[in-house]
């Protein structure tokens, strides 16, 4: 019997608990860390790796991916979609700059209510979406990396240069958070021969990974991105390959990790994209249907900022 693919994740978390290198980190929380890990997930059977040993809010994950694809960098549009995962960084900046002891809810309400306030305090700098869709080179010219990937997949699918990334050295200092999942590379194969349907796979290099909170969220949205691009270029879904650089478990997540390790995975759900928009920019959250998702209860844990 084939071992459930979620055990790759659980085994990695167990390895971190047993042999992870204890170290202090940028956030001051401290971590157990391992370097250079890999997980592989097959999407060709229609499933999607939404982990089941705790509840993953897949719609929030996909909404963030759709936001990346718009090229936007302000949290205001995310908040209007009830997505609050980026608020911590601009909120911390606001509190430090003003000395105001404002609550997260009050801050978010002001961002949504006032375009002027959102413009001043809600922008994250040139983070993921800006680099994906409007990378600026030395002469000031903008490049749409996503459009280039899709065009190359259609015209030169065997190229070894089909990738995009977000590590723009010249703009790192202006980002609220440096890119964690930074490089996405694509590979086309013909498993049934050159006369058969092409299959699209994607490899993601994540230089830094919060394995408890971040990985389940990122892997879900990366699988959805692969499915979207495969649909846009008329290819079948292949494999998602995930590579972790500094793969870590925060010291204030250890009890939560042990609880999750006590649970057995359930079957992965199915992902259906209900229509094919004219371009990658045409997708909305209503286009995605996840069926047969059964999970254990959610496990809460604090975010390290």
From Swiss-Prot:
Keywords for the protein's UniProt record, in alphabetical order: Cytoplasm, Methyltransferase, Nucleotide biosynthesis, Transferase
Domain of life: Bacteria
A Gene Ontology cellular-component term: cytosol
Binding site for dUMP: 26, 160-161, 207-210, 218, 248-250
SUPFAM superfamilies: Thymidylate synthase/dCMP hydroxymethylase
Gene Ontology annotations of biological process type: dTMP biosynthetic process; dTTP biosynthetic process; methylation
EC number: 2.1.1.45
InterPro entries attached to this UniProt entry: Thymidate_synth/dCMP_Mease, Thymidate_synth/dCMP_Mease_dom, Thymidate_synth/dCMP_Mease_sf, Thymidylate_synthase, Thymidylate_synthase_AS
GO MF term list: thymidylate synthase activity
Reaction(s) catalysed (UniProt annotation): dUMP + (6R)-5,10-methylene-5,6,7,8-tetrahydrofolate = 7,8-dihydrofolate + dTMP
Subcellular locations according to the entry: Cytoplasm
Main location: cytoplasm
Claim: Methyltransferase is one of the keywords in the record: yes
HAMAP family associated with the record: Thymidy_synth_bact
Assembly: Homodimer.
Function summary: Catalyzes the reductive methylation of 2'-deoxyuridine-5'-monophosphate (dUMP) to 2'-deoxythymidine-5'-monophosphate (dTMP) while utilizing 5,10-methylenetetrahydrofolate (mTHF) as the methyl donor and reductant in the reaction, yielding dihydrofolate (DHF) as a by-product. This enzymatic reaction provides an intracellular de novo source of dTMP, an essential precursor for DNA biosynthesis.
Protein name (database record): Thymidylate synthase
Organism annotation: Sinorhizobium fredii (strain NBRC 101917 / NGR234)
Protein's gene: thyA
